[in-house]
From Swiss-Prot:
Annotated source species: Homo sapiens
InterPro entries: Stereocilin-rel, Stereocilin_LRR
Location in or out of the cell: Cell surface; Cell projection, Kinocilium; Cell projection, Stereocilium
Protein name from the UniProt record: Stereocilin
One of the protein's GO biological processes: protein localization
UniProt disease link: Deafness, autosomal recessive, 16: A form of non-syndromic sensorineural hearing loss. Sensorineural deafness results from damage to the neural receptors of the inner ear, the nerve pathways to the brain, or the area of the brain that receives sound information.
Family, per entry: Belongs to the stereocilin family.
Length: 1775
């Protein structure tokens, strides 16, 4: 049992004591009290018990305690200050006894004790005892707990307990509610009387009758243990274990019932704020927040909040007699002789006033008096007469609240300074004193300690010495508190000092005179009780030893905490009951239980007046507080404390008085900590195996509710506590909220609260403690903008105050500030300070504001002061305006330009004014230019400072330009640098010197690399990036650096960048175990492997028995058995690369290792294949689906269709779009078709759908079918626009028609139709601008277009927009006619010059296209094409336009002049394909070698140019038969220029060289035949023996095999190679493709086509074009949607028109339909073309007339439907 039983047993003991340990009114002159008679019979029974039946020590202890109960109390004579013996007063509970004796439970209770005595005397067996009495105990507990809950449990059906009745009984306990009301004070009559001491010689009363013996003290003494349980206690252990089970169950059930009842009752009183349908919520208060946490299972730290403080509860509010102004009833004065019926009731006041006399006439302990009198006035210990002894214990006075303590402190300081210094000043703990004594101690100690020689300037040293503390800290407390009190500093403080440092950090103690500081709250004034005294005394050996002689009761108080051997009675009692009983701690009941209990009861005074009933939570709160104090701190273990604390917290919430009396100010930090931990909880916690739930679906909703309803409360707590950690967590939670919910939250909060939270964010940012990852900076800007909306007016001063957060604002939010913002000098200063963190678009927006004529006038007139003030914005001026800066203006800022971050165009304009080539200080000029030197042309560098030293400062600076991307490695300046390196020889450079050349590594030729030593090469590897190493270089380096023997995992991982150089030889040298271990470090490079390298890597793991057969000849059959997969354990990094044939994972393996698989980036076909393998049940919950991770991306359309609830359907769709992998086209089409079908049906759930959709991702909005675009709300459209701005690659994944529709819809939302498009609208549209139509593009004013040319250069431009833009650029108000362009116009246009027609480009004057300008222009275009966005952009081929652009350089100036012969610098300044075959052939061999990499990588070279370049390569390396593998790889496409005989001479014995040729597209039919025949001949292989590695290596050259030869390929091997071959646009004939497709149908392949799922069609790619006509005609919709778009495009046009019907064509996904080529469309019938157009537009045009449904049941999307409108309105709230 995790929960201790001791609280329950304690209550039972109290009930028994209160029931029987009482003094009854005598019924006759000498009649014994019935209780006394009972005790005597008990004693006689024990005397008759056989010896040895139980533990002898236990019997003797028990007898001794019983015997002592009959002895009257004695007053011992002890030294002064020693407390008298513990003799508590007797209790007279006459009213209660009368009630109890009339109860039917009187007999069962007596029977319980009688049976216990019989058991001890062995008059009955334990079994008989348990049969009779277990029910009595259980019934008592049940009734007790039921009485605490309103209404209680249902009336028990069990019979009432009698002595000889059945054991399954229940106590009626009609007296128990009376007892509880009695304790609450509602019926308290003459409860406690403190009796005078009785003379032991006078055993009779004054009236001659025998006095009742003081047996109560003896009974209470039973609670004091005398020893540990012995080994003979098996009887007691069995008894407790048997009886304990029902008691524990009842106790646990009762506590839960109490808590649940309180929850409901408190909820009905306080209420709970909830968000409305719009997401708005009226904020709650702190009590409601705590109640919300309890209802949502938050674990509040009730100890830190103050609800388990262990301090005695204040007087209950229900006692009117404690109220101010209500006098307490006073008893008459004591009399020497008094009859029992006229006993005096000694008041607390009288007791506390008289107890300090020489002989207190009361039988009560000093400690009880100390407790009783704490509320009247502070207790001061009785000082020892000796001043010396007192000063040795001055520590007592230092912590005492007594006013006299200050006098003692001053006296001891004056008379015994040395002792005072040792006892007080050397103890750093006293720096944490509170009250008036703290300042006195500081002053006294400061006078005794010598001043320190020097105080540390930084954080205090560790450990702190007293002299440093008192001398430095107290001299400048404010300064040192700032250094100590930060969260990081507190963590660094040693644990021994953390307590007092934490106290000091809470602030200085205010000055008080004699009384301690008190808190005035709803309950009045509350003063601390100095309860920390025991902790300080018991933990300090010196203090403890000094104080115990004067106050002996401290020994008992400190016994537990000082690790005494005495065992608490409760602990001894429960020890056998529980396997691991938590320590009970220093509970008062473990220390001195009797006096303590009586002392607590004595604190409840007599009250004669009637008290009205109060609310149940208030009454229960007081009882729980009293119980918690009685049990002591930490008693019962964490679980018991938690349950009690939860009940205490709940019961205090409705009553402000109870709540704020207990709530500690430091509890605010605990609330923030608990909320922070809750918000940090991961909503997805996978379970070990199976489809167990892993996500709490309400967790996200609960967090949203918390933030929406209680953010103002949290903001208030943050303002008070300044917790940076909690602020960070809260801000992160806001950043992850859907924008609409966040907006509702901020707008519904009070204005002052929102402004205060923004101030907190500002402070956190200023202190550098509010950290936001780059991915969430835009969300932080959105939050800041929302908070800014709560300001009625945005001013320049507000901009200055919030300048640390300005970098996170969106441009549109930044533009909300007044236009005159930049006229403020302080604003400009703030921009200068925070400009490094601002985004370029922000600076561009602000820079454009500078151009307002009303601010600063025209650019040429700007003064130098203004230029300096706006320097961070100048690089972001539109280039046309920047070019207006005069040389004088530029030279005025000469020293500032290098660090300004200028772009190429701006930098060139500055250089023209700064560089003076006619002076001699060229090197000094370059040094001053700094980063601007990156933009110098080779000619300028040559004239200023010729490059010659590979380690020189200018050369190093230019290499830094290459490292940061400013200088292109393929440019002319880089070529000059490479010339310096080649001329000096790389061998002379040290490895460290060579490392700085890493940015130009890709341009180093193979010959140069062969000259470098191995240490030099290894030194460069750590600084290289993957893309900076060409495949040829990787082959060369891996062959040199890879150890041939004993390769370790560390060595292989150090070479991971060279993985693309994998060859048969290097792969054979890597042990399989090392490959497995290196999976994690090699994984990032796997995407750079060629298809053949990937296949070879996979082959390594599937060789039978791990034996490789990869000899140099490669002869012999494959070691794998055809058609039979070999069980293989694949490394995780290789699993996403596996062909379906090798993906042998069964359902059990997938489910058992789900955590291993759910995060892998599975391909579309793999996910579909594994989904089928798992046989996912149709009733799978959303939580189960989320547990599948990326495997859920393979979900089938049938599974979606079987989801009944619309809410569940939309949640699943949301989950799919949240996956890191893309939603496959067929699943996307299924989602929207299914949504259309559901909207056409009566759907009662539409009225309940709403908040569930708020969390859907904006990616879903972006992916909406074209037809739904017009129905989106404006807010939803803006969410899509924001998504596109953040991630433009997601826009480029859509079809062109989709992109255009989205752009037009966004423009419609931002600007009315036929109105000019403003600059703000253009900036808001962002990348969508490039897909506007002709009419919309012409709505852009030309001046606005001109000022946004720099932004347009970074966007993907659709064909329509690009054509229209090219026409607009030539207008007079933009750039004008091309024949009039100068260099400035070319630089302004940038890469947009390619939007001009070829004719217009050819008209640009040769003078405007100088070598430098031309190189920069082509570099910018190439950089764009190689960027991620550029690679996704479907721009038209620019070969003709590029040729027209460079015509003035590559063609002679006059027809009669010869063609210029290029050198390598000329080629780098243009591009290889710009030069003719004749010009290439006439190049110098050294120049060609330096540019060989560029020639091999240019896809624009024609056949003649390829032959010319290949001729130069043969001059360089000799005949082709001698080419090494790395040379063949470097030649690349140039190999097409080989003659037939030379091609036959190439050595093609392994897959390494073969794959190089197989990757080349563009071979002639003859060359294809030569390559494959040469390989088969040289390797000695037959076609039937080609494994999937060699089939993959053949690549494009596979089409060199004749159809009859292709038939011999192994279907098993080919079905694996199909994954790689299907990605190629194979130049095979239709007959060859049909043979290849037929191989996949054979038994070793995938079987009959009719059985193929869509994943098979996706796997085989373009090979699907060879499927026979009949088979294609019979394909179902799901199968068709599995065909890749590339496969669609390669189907021969006649075949395409024959095999696909209009219905099949209409089922194409939009991506498939867009892939249909114009040639294919030309062969289609009108109906087929309409079907393709319908699929391209996603249903906008139906293939059947008048909107009739197709065979697929699709409705006309344009027909109005209330359900459609409702759905779109919901989708408008997706975020």
């Amino acid at each position: 049992m995790a929960l201790s039983l001791w609280p329950l047993l304690l209550l039972l003991l109290l009930l028994l004591l209160l029931s029987f340990a009482v003094t009854l009114a005598p019924t006759g002159p000498h009649s014994l009290d019935p209780g006394l008679s009972f005790l005597k019979s008990l004693l006689s029974t024990l005397d008759q018990a056989p010896q040895g039946s139980l533990s002898r020590s236990r019997f003797f202890t028990f007898l001794a305690n019983i015997s002592s109960s009959f002895e009257p109390g004695r007053m011992g004579e002890g030294p002064v200050g020693e407390p008298p013996p513990l003799q508590p007063p007797a209790l007279r509970l006459h009213d209660f006894l009368v009630t109890l004796r009339g109860s039917p439970d009187w007999e069962p209770m007596l029977g319980l004790l009688g049976d216990m005595l019989a058991l001890l005397g062995q008059e009955q067996t334990p079994r008989d005892f348990l049969v009779h009495q277990a029910g009595v105990l259980g019934g008592l507990v049940e009734v007790l707990l039921g009485a605490l809950v309103p209404g209680g449990p249902p009336t028990p059906t069990r019979p009432p307990c009698t002595r000889d009745g059945p054991s399954d009984c229940v106590l009626a306990a009609d007296w128990l509610p009376s007892l509880l009301l009695l304790l609450e004070g509602t019926r308290w009559q003459a409860l406690v009387q403190v009796q005078p001491s009785v003379d032991p010689t006078n055993a009779t009363g004054l009236d001659g009758r025998e006095a009742a013996p003081h047996f109560l003290q003896g009974l209470l003494g039973l609670l004091t243990p005398t020893g540990e349980l012995g080994s003979k206690e098996a009887l007691w252990g069995g008894l407790l274990r048997t009886v304990g089970a029902p008691l524990y169950a009842a106790f646990q059930e009762g506590l839960l019932r109490v808590t649940h009842s309180l929850q409901d009752e408190v909820f009905s009183i306080l209420g709970q704020p909830e968000p409305d349908t719009n997401g708005q919520c009226q904020g709650g208060n702190l009590q409601q927040l705590l109640l919300w946490g309890v209802r949502h299972n938050l674990s509040w730290d009730v100890q830190a909040l103050g609800f388990l403080s262990g301090s005695p509860p204040p007087p209950p509010a229900l006692l009117h007699c404690l109220s101010t102004g209500v006098p307490l009833p006073r008893a008459s004065q004591p009399s020497a002789h008094i009859s029992p019926r006229q006993r005096r009731a000694i008041t607390v006041e009288a007791l506390c006033e008289n107890h300090l006399g020489p002989a207190p006439p009361y039988s009560i302990s000093n400690f009880s008096i100390h407790l009783l009198c704490q509320h009247t006035k502070p207790a001061t210990p009785q000082p020892h007469p000796s001043t010396t002894a007192i000063c040795q214990t001055a520590v007592w006075y230092a912590v005492s609240w007594a006013p006299g303590a200050q006098g003692w402190l001053q006296a001891c300081h004056d008379q015994f300074p040395d002792e005072f210094l040792d006892a007080i000043c050397s103890n750093l703990s006293f720096s944490a004193l509170s009250g008036s004594n703290r300042r006195l101690v500081k002053r006294l100690c400061a006078g005794l300690l010598p001043p320190p020689t020097s105080c540390p300037e930084g954080l205090p040293p560790v450990p702190l010495t007293p002299d440093i503390f008192w001398g430095c800290f107290l001299e400048n407390e404010t300064l040192w508190a700032e250094r100590l009190c930060g969260e990081a500093s507190l963590q660094a403080v040693p644990p021994s000092n953390q307590a007092w440092v934490q106290h000091v950090c809470q602030g200085p103690t205010p000055d008080v005179t004699a009384s301690p500081p008190c808190h005035i709250g709803p309950c009045g004034e509350r003063c601390p009780d100095g309860g920390s005294f025991l902790v300080m005394v018991c933990a300090n050996d010196t203090m403890y030893e000094v104080l115990v002689p004067f106050w002996p009761w401290l020994a008992g108080q400190c016994r537990i905490s000082r690790g005494g051997n005495d065992t608490c009675f409760l602990e001894g009692l429960l020890g056998p009951l529980l396997p691991s009983l938590p320590p009970l701690g220093p509970s008062p009941l473990c220390l001195t239980p009797g006096p303590f209990l009586l002392g607590m009861l004595s604190q409840l005074p007599r009250c004669q007046s009637s008290v009205p009933a109060l609310a149940h939570p208030t009454r229960l709160h007081y009882l729980l507080r009293l119980l918690t104090f009685l049990l002591g701190p930490g008693a019962g273990g964490a679980e018991a404390q938690g349950m009690l604390g939860r009940a205490l917290l709940l019961s205090s919430l409705p009553d402000n008085c109870s709540f704020w009396d207990a709530f500690r100010p430091e509890g605010r930090r605990s609330v923030l900590r608990t909320i922070g931990e809750y918000l940090e909880q991961d909503e997805e916690q996978p379970t070990p195996s199976g489809f167990e739930p892993t996500v709490n679906p309400s967790s996200g909703i609960s967090k949203m509710e918390l933030l929406a309803c209680f953010s103002p409360v949290l903001w208030d707590l943050l303002q008070r506590e300044k917790s940076v950690w909690a602020l960070q967590i809260l801000v992160q939670a806001y950043l992850h909220m859907p924008p609409e919910n966040l907006q509702q939250l901020v707008l519904s909060a009070e204005r002052e609260a929102a402004q205060g939270f923004l101030t907190l964010m500002l402070q956190g940012k200023l202190q550098g403690k509010l950290q936001v990852p780059p991915s969430e900076e835009q969300a932080l800007g959105r939050l800041t903008a929302l908070l800014l909306q709560r300001y009625p007016r945005l001013t320049s001063q507000l901009f200055i105050d919030l300048s640390p957060l300005i970098p996170f604002l969106a441009v549109s939010d930044l533009m909300r500030f007044p236009p005159s913002l930049l006229a403020n000098d302080s604003v400009l200063a703030a921009i200068r300070d925070y400009s490094p963190g601002m985004r370029p678009e922000q600076k561009e927006a602000l820079a454009k504001r500078l151009l307002a004529p009303e601010l600063f006038g025209e650019v040429p007139a700007w003064p130098q002061e203004l230029l300096w003030a706006v320097l961070p914005l100048l690089p972001h001026l539109p280039l046309e305006n920047f070019l207006q800066l005069s040389p004088h203006q530029i030279q005025a800022l000469e020293d500032s330009w290098p660090a300004a971050g200028l772009g190429p165009g701006h930098a060139r304009h500055v250089l023209r004014s700064l560089v003076n080539q006619s002076v001699q200080d060229g090197e000094e000029q370059v040094r001053r230019l700094g980063p601007l030197a990156c933009f110098l042309s080779p000619e300028e560098l040559q004239s200023l400072v010729p490059l010659s030293d590979p380690t020189g400062p200018v050369e190093r600076g230019l290499l830094e330009c290459a490292a940061n991307g400013t200088l292109s490695p393929e440019g002319r300046v880089a070529y000059e640098l490479l010339g310096v390196l080649r001329s000096s020889g790389g061998a002379v450079l040290s490895p460290r010197e060579l490392r700085v050349w890493a940015p130009l590594f890709s341009q180093l030729g193979l010959r140069f690399l062969q000259e470098l030593s191995e240490p030099q090469l290894r030194a460069m590897l750590p600084v290289l990036q993957g893309t900076s190493v060409t495949p040829a270089q990787a082959v060369l380096l891996l062959g040199r650096l890879l150890p041939r023997h004993d390769l370790s995992l560390e060595e292989l991982c150090s070479l991971h960048l060279l993985l693309p150089g994998l060859s048969p030889q290097t792969l054979q040298a890597i042990p399989r175990r090392v490959l497995v271990g290196a999976c994690s470090c090699l994984a990032p490079e796997l995407s750079r492997l060629s298809a053949c390298q990937t296949a070879a890597l996979l082959q390594t793991f599937r060789v039978k028995d791990g034996v490789k057969n990869m000899g140099t000849t490669g002869a012999g059959p494959a070691v794998c058995i055809p058609g039979q997969p070999i069980p293989t354990t694949w490394p995780d990094c290789l699993l996403p690369l596996l062909p379906l044939k090798l993906l042998q994972l069964d359902s059990l393996a997938l489910l058992a290792n789900r955590r291993r698989y759910w995060e892998l980036p599975w391909s579309e076909q793999q996910a579909q294949f594994l989904w089928k393998k798992m046989q996912v049940p149709t009733n799978l919950t959303l939580r189960n689906l989320q547990a599948l991770g990326t495997l859920a991306g393979g979900m089938s359309c049938e599974f979606l269709q079987q989801i009944n609830s619309m809410v569940d359907f939309l949640e699943v769709v949301h989950m799919i779009y949240q996956l890191p992998t893309r939603v496959r086209g067929s699943l996307r089409a299924c989602i929207w078709a299914e949504l259309q079908r559901r909207m056409a049906m009566p759907e009662p759930e539409w009225t309940t759908v709403g908040p569930e959709l708020n969390g859907l991702d904006s990616k879903l909005l972006l992916d909406l079918p074209i037809q739904l675009m017009d129905r989106l709300s404006n807010e939803s459209i803006m969410l899509v626009v924001e998504l596109v701005q953040r991630a433009p690659e997601q826009l480029l994944a859509l079809t062109p028609l989709h992109q255009a529709a989205l752009a037009e819809r966004a423009l419609q939302n931002l600007a009315p139709k036929e109105t000019p498009v403003s600059g703000e609208v253009l900036e808001t549209l962002g990348p969508l601008v490039g897909f506007l139509g002709t009419e919309s593009t012409r709505q852009i004013p030309l001046q606005i277009l001109l000022s946004h040319l720099s932004q347009l250069q970074g966007f993907c431009l659709g064909e329509t927009f690009a054509t229209e833009l090219g026409w607009l650029l030539l207008q007079e108000s933009v750039l004008g006619k091309p024949e009039l362009w100068s260099q400035d116009e070319v630089e302004q246009a940038g890469r947009l010059v390619f939007t001009l027609s070829t004719e217009a480009i050819s008209l640009i004057p040769r003078e405007a296209l100088g070598p430098e300008t031309l190189e920069r222009l082509l570099e910018k275009q190439q950089s764009w094409e190689q960027s991620r966005v550029g690679q996704l952009c479907r721009e038209p081929q620019l070969a003709a336009k590029k040729a027209a652009l460079v015509a003035g350089v590559v063609r002679p100036a006059a027809e009669d002049l010869p063609e210029p012969v290029p050198n390598c610098a000329d080629v780098r300044g243009t591009f290889p394909a710009a030069w003719s075959a004749t010009q290439i052939a006439e190049m110098e061999l050294s120049d060609f070698e330096d540019c060989l990499t560029l020639f091999a990588g240019d896809p624009g070279l024609g056949p003649e140019e390829l032959r010319a370049a290949m001729g130069k390569a043969k001059q360089l390396w000799g005949p082709p038969r001698g080419f090494r593998p790395e040379q063949i790889l470097q030649l690349g496409r140039l190999l097409i220029g080989l003659g037939d005989r030379e091609l036959q001479e190439l050595i093609l014995v392994d897959w390494g060289v073969l794959s190089t040729l197989g990757q080349i597209d563009g071979w002639s039919t003859t060359q294809l035949r030569i390559v494959v025949s040469s390989f088969l001949r040289q390797s000695g292989r037959h076609v039937s023996h080609l494994d999937f590695v060699h089939l993959t290596a053949l690549g494009y050259t596979l089409c060199g095999l004749r159809p009859e030869e292709l038939q011999h390929i192994s279907s098993w091997e080919f079905s694996q190679a199909a994954l790689f071959l299907g990605t190629l646009h194979l130049q095979c004939s239709e007959e060859q493709l049909e043979v290849l497709a037929h191989l996949l149908v054979l038994p070793g392949g995938f079987g009959p086509i009719s059985n193929w799922g869509p994943e098979i069609f996706t796997e085989i790619g373009t090979i699907a074009a060879g499927i026979p006509d009949l088979a294609l005609s019979a394909l179902l919709r799901g199968q068709i949607q599995g065909v890749t778009p590339l496969a669609i495009s390669v189907i021969p046009p006649p075949k395409f028109a024959v095999v696909f019907s209009p219905i099949q064509l209409s089922s194409l996904t939009s991506a498939q339909a867009v892939a249909v080529t114009p040639e294919q469309m030309a062969f289609l019938s009108p109906e087929q073309r309409r079907a393709v157009a319908w699929a391209q537009h996603e249903g906008k045009e139906s293939p059947e007339q008048q909107g009739r449904s197709t065979a697929w049941g699709l409705q006309d999307w344009s027909r109005p439907s209330w359900s459609l409108v409702l759905t779109i309105s919901f989708l408008g709230h997706l975020l």
